From Swiss-Prot:
It comes from the Bacteria. GO terms for cellular component: cytosol. Pathway: Metabolic intermediate biosynthesis; chorismate biosynthesis; chorismate from D-erythrose 4-phosphate and phosphoenolpyruvate: step 7/7. Keywords: Amino-acid biosynthesis, Aromatic amino acid biosynthesis, FAD, Flavoprotein, FMN, Lyase, NADP. It comes from Bartonella quintana (strain Toulouse). GO terms for biological process: amino acid biosynthetic process; aromatic amino acid family biosynthetic process; chorismate biosynthetic process. Its EC number is 4.2.3.5. GO terms for molecular function: chorismate synthase activity; FMN binding. NADP(+) binds at R48, R54. This is Chorismate synthase.
Length: 366
């Protein structure tokens, strides 16, 4: 299985399976001299970690990150400095229950990658879904924590803005609220609504989809290039690579199709500091594939977890009709834990373009 690497200069290769001994990533192209601590990386992993509420999978993983290469430990024993060589990060699996998947050894779960993996490779890892499991994304979150360190002042924040048919009220958006509830939602009034809805979905043995929004601030103008190296192209690719993501939009996205040219145009004026000021941000911070200096705004849709407890029609590996019921521990709404994953992937895409711009142009916005 190829294509496990993302990026051009800041390259992240993830490895490992959901029910293997461990998983992790190798980061190649990280500049030397970047300082960080394992505690900083761990804080992002803790945000994604399973088993922290009844709204996520009850699989209990500590997700303690270990660093194997590419850094020098400073005198304080905590600060690490990158050397410019490959950085290897490892996260051990400690709570696998492969026996839960015994009933689907020869069956394909509807909506899952079981069938397509088998068609392509002639073999599949039925234990937890292997590389098709959301567990694979833990390593991406670790890489994203380092990516944030490369672009000076970069802030990447995500929020869950819809679960099933329930949407937040954007007038109540509060970034401080995101860290105060298990849904990472910026609308405090939607917390009990989301809670009741997911409780109902879980009791019915089913799952539900979600919508996530990511905002990246302090992104320099000039990142990206026309045609085949557009920043929004790579951001979309990074988000679509996340397991269970089925759609991505930048800025107003599909809503732009309903606007007129006057409504959609991000008009400009010169600010008092001598720098351009945009009067709106319909483009989501990217014009012609190049960052404008405005906040980059992206949203992605996460499908319902296909591993559910209700009976569904499918076939087995011999072509026989079967009814499938999936046992095991699964997220009733995997979109919740996709928030830190989306943050990480956008951070990696921006860091990669930052290094590419620095190498090609050598300067940033005036």
């Amino acid at each position: 299985m190829s294509h496990n690497t993302f990026g051009h200069l800041f390259r992240v290769t993830t490895w490992g399976e959901s029910h293997g001994v461990a998983l992790g990533c190798v980061i190649d192209g990280c500049p030397p001299g970047i300082t960080f601590t394992l505690a900083e990386i761990q804080s992002y992993l803790d945000k994604r970690r399973p088993g922290q509420s009844r709204y996520t999978t009850q699989r209990r993983e500590l997700d303690q990150v270990e660093i194997l290469s590419g850094v020098i430990v400073q005198d304080d024993g905590a600060t690490l400095v990158t050397t410019g060589t490959p950085i290897s990060l490892l996260i051990r699996n400690t709570d696998q229950r492969s026996k839960d998947y015994g009933s689907i050894v020869h069956q394909y779960r509807p909506g899952h990658a079981d069938y397509t993996y088998d068609v392509k490779y002639g073999i599949r890892d039925f234990q937890g879904g292997g590389r098709a499991s959301a567990r694979e994304t833990a390593a991406r979150v670790a890489a994203g924590a380092l990516a944030r360190k490369i672009v000076p002042g970069l802030i990447v924040r995500g929020a869950l803005i819809a679960i099933g048919p329930h949407n937040i009220n954007r007038d109540r958006w509060d970034w401080l609220e995101v860290e105060n509830n298990p849904f990472f939602t910026p609308d405090a009034e939607m917390v009990p609504v989301f809670s009741d809805y997911i409780d109902t979905v879980r009791k019915n043995g089913s799952s539900v989809g979600a919508l996530v929004e990511i905002v990246a601030e302090n992104v320099p103008a000039g990142l990206g290039a026309p045609i085949y190296a557009k920043l929004d192209q790579d951001i979309a690719s990074s988000l679509m690579s996340i397991n269970a993501v089925k759609g991505v939009e930048i800025g107003d996205g599909f809503a732009a199709a309903c606007l007129t040219g006057e409504e959609n145009a991000d008009e400009m004026r010169m600010g008092s500091d001598g720098k351009p000021v945009f009067l709106s941000n319909h483009a989501g911070g990217i014009l012609g594939g190049i960052s404008s200096g405005q906040p980059i705004v992206a949203r992605f849709a996460v499908k319902p977890t296909p591993s559910i407890l209700t009976s569904r029609r499918s076939i087995d590996v011999d072509g026989n009709d079967v009814n499938v019921i999936t046992k095991g521990r699964h997220d009733p709404c995997v979109g919740i834990r996709a928030v830190p994953v989306g943050e990480a992937m956008i951070a990696c895409a921006i860091a990669d373009h930052y290094l590419r711009h620095r190498g090609q142009v050598g300067r940033f916005e005036r």
